[in-house]
């Protein structure tokens, strides 16, 4: 079996350690919660990942994970306890303790039943580079054993062991239990859950039911109880819930958009189908009208074929009825034209009469002039003859006029 070695990362710097402790203090309500269920464990895991992101934001060159940050805090806490135990042994078990760092004091100040450590400046200040180097050297050494054969590899069967050079801490990730060797006499105590061990790292005498007032209880199935609905003091809990809600809303909107797209396509297909149905309806309507016209045409042809004699009889009777009426009308029309011609002829005769009258007067004047040169007997004879001729002519014209226009 071939062992694959991983390159060891660099130690945590002073700024990374200080940032780590500050972020843990901000999230202590979640990290050190004594409730154990799926929801709390998930919230703890996300809290450690957020702390790792804050540490990586410093830009020290190493990308820390949530597990590495968690292990670093455990090592730092164990180192502080070891120094405190050593100081107790050297001082003969007196109540005087060596002063710890300011960040350790700030974390320990949150407890109720343990007094705070001394606040004076000391050589154990975390800002001292020597102490930081000493704490960094006591970091856990990671050894990962992997099998080369892929058939013999199983996901949950790999083991990760962490050995501490000072305390002899051994972590078995598969069994999820931690063994501590606090003294050289090999006294061991076992904690079944790793998350519960975190609650014992910081001294805290509060019971399970003595949680912060702002932190609502979480029931067995991971749902918030309706007893305490006060807003959380820490905003990251609300942020996590809002992120999950936004993700669900985003998925719902995506599904809704797909549904609307399918509905739009369905409506388009339905519109096309209706358009084809309208065209088919119009075509059938035109065909119906054409058949109606053909039917009327055939009916007329049948009627003309069956009743030709009736039509002929009707035409003859109509002619016989209209014939006498036409003759009378023609007669009246001819009479009217005849009267019109007679009237014109009378006008011509009247014009002739006037003309003759003028001629008579002229002749009378001429005779009057010739009386002086012709004897009286001859003149009298000629005048009498002319008067007789004129009288006969005038009487003839008058008789003709009376015969043409009676009563005039």
Curated annotation (Swiss-Prot):
UniProt keyword annotations, A-Z: Coiled coil
Keyword Coiled coil appears in the UniProt entry: yes
InterPro entries documented for this protein: MSANTD4 (IPR026162), Myb_DNA-bind_5 (IPR028002)
Entry annotated with the keyword Coiled coil: yes
PANTHER family in the record: MYB/SANT-LIKE DNA-BINDING DOMAIN-CONTAINING PROTEIN 4, MYB_SANT-LIKE DNA-BINDING DOMAIN-CONTAINING PROTEIN 4
Protein name, UniProt field: Myb/SANT-like DNA-binding domain-containing protein 4
Annotated ranges, domain Myb-like: 4-77
Coiled coil: 236-367
Highest taxon, organism lineage: Eukaryota
The organism of origin for this protein: Xenopus tropicalis (Western clawed frog)
Source species taxonomy: Eukaryota, Metazoa, Chordata, Craniata, Vertebrata
């Amino acid at each position: 079996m071939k062992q694959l070695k991983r390159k060891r990362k660099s130690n945590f710097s002073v700024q990374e350690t200080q940032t780590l402790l500050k972020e843990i203090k901000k999230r202590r309500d979640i990290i050190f919660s004594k409730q154990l269920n799926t929801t709390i464990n998930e919230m703890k895991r996300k809290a450690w990942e957020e702390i790792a992101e804050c540490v990586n934001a410093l830009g020290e060159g190493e990308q820390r994970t949530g597990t590495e940050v968690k292990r670093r805090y455990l090592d730092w806490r164990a180192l502080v306890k070891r120094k405190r135990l050593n100081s107790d042994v050297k001082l003969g078990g007196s109540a005087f303790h060596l002063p710890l760092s300011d960040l350790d004091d700030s974390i320990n100040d949150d407890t109720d039943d343990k007094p705070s450590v001394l606040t004076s400046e000391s050589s154990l200040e975390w800002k001292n580079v020597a102490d930081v180097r000493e704490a960094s050297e006591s970091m856990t050494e990671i050894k990962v054993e992997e099998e080369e054969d892929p058939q013999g590899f199983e996901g949950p069967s790999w083991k990760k062991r962490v050995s501490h050079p000072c305390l002899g801490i051994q972590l078995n990730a598969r069994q999820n239990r931690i063994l501590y060797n606090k003294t050289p006499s090999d006294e061991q105590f076992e904690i079944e859950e790793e998350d519960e061990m975190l609650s014992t790292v910081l001294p805290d005498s509060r019971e399970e039911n003595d949680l912060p007032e702002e932190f609502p209880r979480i029931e067995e199935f991971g749902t918030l109880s309706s007893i305490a609905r006060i807003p959380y003091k820490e905003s990251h809990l609300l942020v996590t819930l809002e992120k999950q809600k936004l993700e669900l809303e985003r998925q719902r909107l995506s599904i809704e958009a797909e549904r609307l797209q399918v509905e739009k396509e369905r409506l388009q297909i339905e519109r096309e189908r209706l358009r084809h149905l309208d065209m088919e309806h119009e075509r059938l309507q035109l065909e119906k009208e054409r058949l109606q016209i053909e039917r009327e045409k055939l009916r007329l042809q049948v009627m003309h074929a069956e009743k030709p004699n009736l039509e002929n009889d009707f035409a003859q009777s109509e002619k016989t009825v209209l014939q006498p009426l036409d003759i009378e009308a023609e007669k009246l029309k001819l009479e009217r034209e005849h009267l019109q011609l007679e009237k014109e002829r009378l006008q011509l005769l009247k014009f002739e009469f006037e003309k003759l009258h003028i001629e008579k007067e002229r002749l009378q004047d001429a005779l009057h002039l010739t009386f002086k040169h012709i004897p009286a007997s001859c003149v009298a004879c000629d005048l009498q003859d002319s008067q007789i001729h004129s009288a006969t002519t005038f009487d003839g014209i008058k008789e003709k006029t009376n015969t043409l226009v009676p009563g005039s």
